[in-house]
Amino acid sequence: MSLNSAEKAEIINEYKRGDKDTGSPEVQVSLITSRIKYLTDHFKENKKDFHSRRGLQELVNKRRKLLKYLKRNDQDRYQTLIQNLGLRDSY
């Protein structure tokens, strides 16, 4: 896996909405984005790793669905999240 517990805790603390928040869309999208970044670096060295490529596609789709949900329900939180993560507004 790409993230250890300390890195996950750091990301969760940055994007959490409450004290024990680990499931808000912001936290989920930020964790998925860090895994996507790790996998894209992984594919630069391992071009034939097609099994992980399928996992990457699943992560991208999951992030897309979460961002679409967040945009539909709270536009302000969506805008701040994509600005913080450096994503395009294409959802």
Curated annotation (Swiss-Prot):
On whether Electron transport is a keyword of this UniProt record, the answer is no
Gene Ontology biological process terms from the UniProt entry = translation
Q: Which cysteines are joined by disulfide bonds?
A: none
| InterPro entries attached to this UniProt entry | Ribosomal_uS15 (IPR000589), Ribosomal_uS15_bac-type (IPR005290), uS15_NS1_RNA-bd_sf (IPR009068)
Give the NCBIfam families listed for this entry. S15_bact
User: Known PANTHER family for this protein?
Assistant: RIBOSOMAL PROTEIN S15, BACTERIAL AND ORGANELLAR, SMALL RIBOSOMAL SUBUNIT PROTEIN US15M
Q: Which purpose does this protein serve, as stated in its record?
A: One of the primary rRNA binding proteins, it binds directly to 16S rRNA where it helps nucleate assembly of the platform of the 30S subunit by binding and bridging several RNA helices of the 16S rRNA. Forms an intersubunit bridge (bridge B4) with the 23S rRNA of the 50S subunit in the ribosome.
How this chain assembles, per its entry, is: Part of the 30S ribosomal subunit. Forms a bridge to the 50S subunit in the 70S ribosome, contacting the 23S rRNA.
- Family statement: Belongs to the universal ribosomal protein uS15 family.
Entry protein name: Small ribosomal subunit protein uS15
Q: Which gene encodes it?
A: rpsO
